[in-house]
Amino acid sequence: TDFMLSELKKGDSVCVMGAPKEANEKYEAFFIEWNKKRVKKGVSLKILYNHDSKEFGKKREKLPLTEVRYMKKELETPAWVDLFHDYVVTLNVHTTPVCFVIKNKETAQSYKEYFNVLWKQAKK
């Protein structure tokens, strides 16, 4: 989101956990523009896509400052989580879009540790 980009500066990173196919289908144009701005700002991205989102992951793999992996099928959910600084942003666009933001250092660190475990298990 624009809020996220406003909080980030060159050298920062974003981790995305569980990017679902449905969200990419609905918001692909937005994600393309957001990623252009992110790359221009010098912000790196590590994204764990749901298993069924490979067509979108293949597009993102070509972007600078971007690493992509895919979660196991049994871990797929309609919601996803964005992690940056002390923020945990959870989104779900399955039916009525829902988004909530937590700003808490300990909570963000817990989610990042979970992300790192999943990242190590995920496939390229």
Give residue ranges: language-model regions.
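PLD/PLD-like phosphodiesterase catalytic module centered on the HKD motif
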Residues: 1, 23-124
